[in-house]
């Protein structure tokens, strides 16, 4: 499941 937003995924 994709729970990250476009902005949040940057932290991974």
UniProtKB/Swiss-Prot annotation:
It comes from the Eukaryota. GO terms for cellular component: chloroplast thylakoid. The keyword Chloroplast applies. It is found in: Plastid, Chloroplast thylakoid. Keywords: Chloroplast, Plastid, Thylakoid. On the 2D-gel the determined pI of this protein is: 5.6, its MW is: 37.3 kDa. This is Unknown protein from spot 123 of 2D-PAGE of thylakoid. It comes from Pisum sativum (Garden pea).
